[in-house]
Amino acid sequence: MTLDDLIIKTVSPVVKPVVPNLYTGESVRYCTFNYSELAEGIGDNAAHLTRALVQVHYFAPLKASTLAVRHALRDAIAAVDNFTLPSIENATDETGQHYVLEFDAVGRWEAEDDGQS
């Protein structure tokens, strides 16, 4: 399973749709995610693990009640063995609510083919 697959599997029971990077659909409530990868557990000139600095972005209409969903997202992420408890940053602006859940993921995942040579 790739890290993308694991994030989607974790977030989608709470919010759908959930996609990497950019959502271009019609839903007014959705999640996107992105992450940076760092070598972890380095020894014998090799990285034995990867630490991903993950951001899950939850978007909703300005007047929507989102507290229960934000807490459900936090709890779902925290329940994954190799994910840390996320912080939640409010990035809301005049176009809608936007919450960023930031956490670390440490492990070994299958490689994701990004389609670039």
What are these regions (language model features)?
Residues M1-L53, F59-S117:
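Long, contiguous binding/interaction regions
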